[in-house]
Amino acid sequence: MKIATQNQAFFPTSIMEKFEYIKAMGFDGYEIDGRLLVENLDEVKAAIKATGLPVTTACGGYDGWIGDFIEERRLNGLQQIERILEALAEVGGKGIIVPAAWGMFTFRLPP
């Protein structure tokens, strides 16, 4: 079994140091923040090559939700998710985690 981790607040901020830290803790992969990946793609590629630690998936890193009732926000989220998936493909990642919308639908749903 292989075990990966998401980014955590106590991890180093430098991308290379982050990868080295995760590898030193014994993890087999890294579930990266989508925005971090897209905005630092070349640096992430270099860290993967240097450490051998793969980016397996991405979680978060987009501003809209795919189920948002406001069309503009939904489309914005989809565009950002598309960029994240393209970047993931470049580093060999397998997919993106799209968690629940933290109550965004509660104003539309009955109690």
Positions of PLM-derived features:
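Acidic (Asp/Glu)-rich catalytic clusters
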Residues: 19-24, 38-59, 82-93
